[in-house]
Structures are given as C-alpha cells and as structure tokens.
From Swiss-Prot:
Organism field: Homo sapiens
Organism placement in taxonomy: Eukaryota, Metazoa, Chordata, Craniata, Vertebrata
Impact after mutating T175A: Kinase activity decreased by two fold
Function: Protein kinase which is involved in the control of centrosome separation and bipolar spindle formation in mitotic cells and chromatin condensation in meiotic cells. Regulates centrosome separation (essential for the formation of bipolar spindles and high-fidelity chromosome separation) by phosphorylating centrosomal proteins such as CROCC, CEP250 and NINL, resulting in their displacement from the centrosomes. Regulates kinetochore microtubule attachment stability in mitosis via phosphorylation of NDC80.
Keyword Phosphoprotein carried by entry: yes
Gene (name only): NEK2
Listed name of the protein: Serine/threonine-protein kinase Nek2
Gene Ontology process terms (BP): blastocyst development; cell division; centrosome separation; chromosome segregation; meiotic cell cycle; mitotic cell cycle; mitotic spindle assembly; negative regulation of centriole-centriole cohesion
Amino acid sequence: MPSRAEDYEVLYTIGTGSYGRCQKIRRKSDGKILVWKELDYGSMTEAEKQMLVSEVNLLRELKHPNIVRYYDRIIDRTNTTLYIVMEYCEGGDLASVITKGTKERQYLDEEFVLRVMTQLTLALKECHRRSDGGHTVLHRDLKPANVFLDGKQNVKLGDFGLARILNHDTSFAKTFVGTPYYMSPEQMNRMSYNEKSDIWSLGCLLYELCALMPPFTAFSQKELAGKIREGKFRRIPYRYSDELNEIITRMLNLKDYHRPSVEEILENPLIADLVADEQRRNLERRGRQLGEPEKSQDSSPVLSELKLKEIQLQERERALKAREERLEQKEQELCVRERLAEDKLARAENLLKNYSLLKERKFLSLASNPELLNLPSSVIKKKVHFSGESKENIMRSENSESQLTSKSKCKDLKKRLHAAQLRAQALSDIEKNYQLKSRQILGMR
C-alpha cells in the first residue's frame, strides 16, 4: 500500500529552497526520523511530471552508505505537491561547516578533507559505475549544500538530479537565484554534461573546504563565466600538502578528458588507506544486511579479505574498461587531427602549385617579349590605349623601334633572360626544400 502524507508527523521545517520546503518528519508506524522535500508540480507539463516521477524512482534504487537514502514518494493531487521522503542527516551539510570555519577563522583539518574526498568519490563511483548494472546517474548539482553529515560525521551525498528536474521552463526554474560557482567549463560553453563535470564540481567543493571560498568568485555570472573559462585560481593554503593540492588541481583542469576518473582518484596513494578501510566497512555492512552473524565474520578474516580482493579486482576491471574507452576517444580525436593536417597540407601544396604556374607564365611572357625587361615599370604598368596618336602611344613606338635596331642591347637582353631563368631554377629548388620541411613539421605534429 502506498504511503500517504498522513502517515508522517511533521516536526519542524529545516529550511526552504528553490524546490520548496525541507521538513523533519517522524514515521508514525515505527517512529523513524526522516525528512521530506516538498515539490509543487502544479505548473509542470505532463511530460515534466512523468520525468519527475521516473527520476525519483531511479533515485530510490541508489543504495550506498555515502548516498542519502531515498525511501518513498508521496503525491498529493489535491495540493499538487510531491513529497520525497529521504534519510535524515543530523550532522547538517558541508555549507554550514564552511560557514562556521569562516566565522571562526579556522581551517579544517586535512584529515577531514581527505575523508570527505574518499567518501564522496565512492558515492560518485556508485553513481557512475552502478554495482547493480543500472543506468549511470549524474549528480549535476554537487555543492556543499547538497553534501550532508550523519551523527558519526560520515559523508552523505544528496539531492540527486533535482536541479536537472527543476531547471526546465517551470516556476521553480525561474526562482533560481545565486551564482553558479561550481559550474563546469562544459556547462559554460553549452556542451553536454558528463561524468567529468561531476569531477570538476568535486574539485571545486574540496577547494572550498580547504580555502573556505570557491576557486572562482565574481560579482556577476558573466564575470564568473570568464574566470571559469580562463581556469586560473590560487593554490589552496600552504598548510595543506602538495599532494592534496595536486589532485585538486587535476580535478579543475579545463579539458574534461584530462581530469581524473573516480577510479584514478581512489587509486591515489594519498587516500589509498582510507579507501581500503571504507570498502572493508561497506563489506561488513553488506554482510550484516544479508543476515551473516558477526562472529562468523570475526572467525574467518581470510574470507572477508578474499571478498575485499574480489571487489578490488572488479573495480580494476571497470577502471581498465574506462581507460580503454578514453584511449579509443583519443584515437578518434587523433584521426580527426590527422585529417585536418592532411587538408592543410593539400591546400598548401595547391597554393605552391598555383604560385609556380603563375611565375612560369610570367617568365614565359618575358621570354616572348624580351624588350619588356628594359622598360621602366611605369611604362609596363600603364596600359593606356587611346585612338589616334597620343603621347603614350608615340613614346612606346619610338622606344620599341630604337631597341629593335640595336644589336648590342639585344645581346644584353639575352644575357638578362638567361640570368632570370637561372634565378627561376634556384627559386624552384628553394620551394621544393620548403615544401619538404613543411611536410616534416606537419608529420611531427
């Protein structure tokens, strides 16, 4: 039987946002403390409503220790309100942690930042490489306000897909306010959102945990877009290690294919021990959920170690597959670049050929009319033809008659023509050498 709003008791309102209200509730059947978010779907089209319901159903399938658990959805058709029932995180969100550190002028410990990095990356890995073989889920709105902490300070990633659901031409989309500090360069350039866009947002979040401010700040969205496209930011405070700064810098690479994947982040030596501990704990949780007694786990550490190694092998296989896909993508890009280089070379050869033909025609015209070599340039350029005996026609006829009757000048013209032919041959050799060098340069690229 589907749940109803009457099955829950509202305790108090935690906060409000572009989506509506977030309230702390108690389930009447067992007293479990949860939260729900109210979404007013009254102004949505039927297609958007269907997408909203299917998206929430998909989110219910995400089950991971570092992902906020989605329990149920309740549709109140009378008030055109959708309630999304989720896990309650009593530790608040990372935005409040950053605000507290800013007010107290106190940086967060690197150990805490590394734990956040580890657990968030494991959460993203579950979304990008679904363990149950389901469709890839992209978060699309990873920021401190959407990352929560439980009572033991474990990280819980929440609010999946809600930004994408609401960012349509609906009343909710129009109520969006604020500056998108974590928006990736792909989004700024109106390109498709991908897994590496989540990695960019993760890098921005980790940067803000260290510096207590985003890597890119501005007073307007236009100015911010320019700074993000430029991709320049300060180093995190020097109290943090170079290794942490290096991995955050890699996450904030402008080229998405240069950013590390979730597998590459988890394999980083900086958090390798933390990753192993988290995976061991997750394995123990799965065992308890399957009804395995804790004593049998304690009595057979070899079995649990084998299971852990099996999981690690599966993860490495997935990482290898992802790397193969990236290599194929790079090969395709290289093929495109090679075609462009061949086109450029063909155009260059065509230009050289046309230039050579033009030059040959010029020399042939000079050879057929050797008297043009000794004429002033002003006379050659002027092609004035008037009817009757004008000054120009009289000058040209007198000069040509005097040159044709002079044998000594004719010999001189032949010598000059021979010298011009030699120069043409030398120029042709230089052009061939230049053509060879240009091909070598294009081959190096």
